[in-house]
Structures are given as structure tokens and as C-alpha cells.
Regions:
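Intrinsically disordered regulatory tails of 7TM GPCRs
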Residues: 1-18, 228-252, 314-357
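Loop architecture of class A 7-transmembrane GPCRs
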Residues: 11-19, 90-109, 113-114, 136, ...
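First transmembrane helix
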Residues: 25-54
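Extracellular TM2-ECL1-early TM3 structural module of rhodopsin-like
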Residues: 26-34, 61-125, 136, 140
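Fourth transmembrane helix
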Residues: 74, 85-91, 115-125, 132, ...
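Hydrophobic alpha-helical segments of membrane proteins
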Residues: 74-84, 161-164, 168, 209, ...
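Intracellular effector-coupling site of seven-transmembrane GPCRs
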Residues: 183-192, 204-207, 224-269
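Seventh transmembrane helix
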Residues: 214, 261-274, 290-341
Length: 357
């Protein structure tokens, strides 16, 4: 979902006068972005901190979710400041000059869209992990951490490779004494719009359609399998069976909700871009507020995901409380001085206590 490549065609300031928007409107939009930026920075940082501080939370699923949180951190660092600049200075305005400015003109959209690509691929990894855990529970218990690390590295590599053209197509142009960060496929492609259409379709098929179809198929199989497992098994005690089913359903619920949120947040923007490319041809001034709305909804997913994780994952809430409690005591650091002792075990949903010294 290369939102930044299409930025110059679907941004909020498609009118000739970038400042014709009222001050109140600009202030409201800036405030909205500031809010989700703060939530995204704090929420995703908390997920990464808790997962990597508490060893018991370093399961394959949680590591994939932490990886998604790391990618979501790129949104408030690159996408949102860029959007706030456009709100006040106009579409594609670039305020940083020199070689550093040129480098950031290329890297900002690159990191922005790498973030989305890593997120959707991480969701696919979570789905594959859930499928593996439900269908092959014995093998899943001995899954090597190296496999998880390789999968995460592969996800980031794919995201950077497919978006590597950004390093070529994004350039700074001087227009009427002002710098603009714009994309251009020429050379070697003379028809810039046609090149954008082809690239967008390829990215949509590879990074959106294929992962979502895979995720849907895997979760459908998992749901069917879990329903069949509701029948008691002779080789499992009733308590053990119920514990495993509860654990699988809790993680499945979290994973499915995150996927639904992703689809709901990105569908409006994707639809808008399709209409822009294949129906309208050019975004009209009267569509500027709609363009802003769909971009804001898409960017807000980086703030929504941490909230979803906090709501649906009791183990994460406990872990966050433990880390915050330990750090607030000012007598220990979670990685060294916090000794975490299990007091009850329920599959991977352990209850644990923290002692600070």
C-alpha cells in the first residue's frame, strides 16, 4: 500500500492556493495528527519495551506483533510530520535543503511505505504462526527463535526491496522559489502516470491482496479446526483441553481484530486511490477534505494497534504493569534487577510476580 508514492496526487492541498483553508481547519487537522502521533509513539514503544524486557512474553506471536509495532513507529516518525507540513505549507512542500534534504526526500516516503508493508506481512506471519500452533502444537512448542528472527528479517528485506525504486523516483524540484519533493519515473518511463498505475497495481497485488487472501485462508482453517476440537479427547484431561482452547481462542481473537482494523483503516484510502487513478484522473479541490480523511484514517492505524493489543491481551497488560511498576520504584532496571518469578502457569498465559531490589 504505497501511500506516499501517491501522496502528490491525493494530498489535502490539491487546490492552487495551499493557504485558502481556514486557520481553524488547519489547527484541527494538526491537533488530530498530534494526538495520534503521541499515542502511536507511546503505545508502540510500550509494546516493544514490554516484549523485549519480559522473556516470558517472547513467544513467536508476540515477537511478530512487536515487529509490527516497530514498523508502526515509522509512521509518527516520518509520515505524520510530513503530513503536518503539507497541512500548513501545501502539497509536497519540502523545507529541508541540500544533500540532507534530498536524502530525506527519498527516505521519508520509503520508510513510510515500508512501515505498511512490514505491518501486513507481520499479520501474515501471525496467521501462519497461529495455523502452525493449532495444527502442529507439538512441533510449535520447539520452534526455534532463529526461525522467528529469519522470518522478521525476510519481511523487512522484502519491504525494502519492493520499495527501493523510491530512492530513484523521488527528487526535489524548485518551483517558484520553493522546494517540492516529487516523484518522477522519467527517465526511463516517459508516461509518469502510467508508470505509477502499473507500480501501484503490482504493490497492491503483492503486499495487500496476496497477504490478505493468505491470512483469510489460514484463519478460516484455524477456526474450523478449533470448532472441531471442542469435542473432548480421550488423551487429554478436561482441564488441560479447556486451558489450551482458551489460550488459542484468546490469541486468535486478538489476531483477527488486528486484521479487521487494518482492513477498515486502509480500505478507504485504497478505494480513493483506485478512483483517482482509474476514474477521476485528477483529484479535484472539492475532494481535498475526503483525501485528508482517508489518509488520516490510514495513518491512525499505528495508534489503534497498541490500543487493541492492550484491550485484548491480558498477558501484555500484566507485563506492562510489571515493567512500569519496576521502573517507577527507581530501585531497579527491568532487564537486570527485576526478578520475575512464576506463581501460576496456564499454557503461555503465565501469571508472574516482580520483585525489585
Amino acid at each position: 500500500m504505497n501511500s506516499s508514492k501517491l501522496y502528490q496526487n491525493t494530498t489535502i492541498s490539491t487546490c492552487d492556493d495551499a493557504f485558502q483553508e481556514s486557520i481553524d481547519s488547519k489547527a484541527a487537522k494538526t491537533t488530530a495528527y498530534a494526538v495520534i502521533m503521541l499515542i502511536s509513539l507511546m503505545g508502540n514503544s510500550a509494546i516493544v519495551l514490554v516484549v523485549f524486557k519480559l522473556q516470558r512474553l517472547q513467544t513467536s506471536t508476540n515477537l511478530f506483533i512487536a515487529n509490527m509495532a516497530m514498523s508502526d513507529l515509522l509512521m509518527p516518525l516520518f509520515a505524520m510530520p510530513r503530513m503536518m507540513t503539507m497541512i500548513h505549507f501545501g502539497a509536497n512542500r519540502w523545507l529541508i535543503g541540500g544533500n540532507f534534504g534530498l536524502a530525506m526526500c527519498k527516505l521519508a516516503p520509503l520508510f513510510q511505505d515500508v512501515s505498511t508493508a512490514v505491518s501486513i506481512q507481520s499479520l501474515a506471519l501471525v496467521a501462519a504462526d497461529r495455523f502452525y500452533n493449532v495444527f502442529y502444537p507439538v512441533k510449535a512448542q520447539v520452534m526455534n527463535l532463529r526461525v522467528v528472527k529469519v522470518a522478521i528479517a525476510l519481511v523487512w528485506s522484502i519491504a525494502f526491496v519492493v520499495h527501493s525504486p523510491y530512492l530513484y523516483i523521488y527528487r526535489i524540484y524548485l518551483q517558484e522559489g520553493k522546494d517540492y519533493c516529487l516523484l518522477s519515473w522519467s527517465p526511463p518511463f516517459a508516461n509518469n502516470m502510467q508508470a505509477q498505475k502499473i507500480y501501484f497495481i503490482l504493490l497492491f497485488a503483492l503486499l495487500i491482496a496476496l497477504p490478505l487472501c493468505t491470512i483469510s485462508a489460514l484463519y478460516t482453517a484455524v477456526v474450523i479446526r478449533l470448532k472441531r476440537q471442542q469435542c473432548p479427547r480421550l488423551h487429554q484431561s478436561d482441564k488441560a483441553r479447556k486451558m489450551r482452547e482458551k489460550h488459542n481462542r484468546a490469541i486468535l481473537q486478538l489476531a483477527i481484530v488486528i486484521v479487521i482494523v487494518f482492513v477498515l483503516c486502509w480500505t478507504p484510502f485504497t478505494t480513493f486511490v483506485f478512483l483517482k487513478f482509474f476514474v477521476w484522473g485528477k483529484t479535484q479541490c472539492r475532494q481535498s477534505h475526503t483525501a485528508f480523511a482517508v489518509q488520516f484514517i490510514a495513518h491512525s492505524i499505528s495508534a489503534i494497534n497498541p490500543c487493541v493489543y492492550a484491550i485484548f491481551s491480558s498477558s501484555y497488560r500484566r507485563g506492562l504493569k510489571e515493567v512500569l511498576t519496576c521502573c517507577a520504584s527507581q530501585r531497579c532496571v527491568p532487564t537486570k534487577s527485576c526478578r520475575i518469578s512464576p506463581v501460576a502457569v496456564d499454557e503461555n498465559l503465565e501469571m508472574q510476580t516482580v520483585r525489585c531490589s
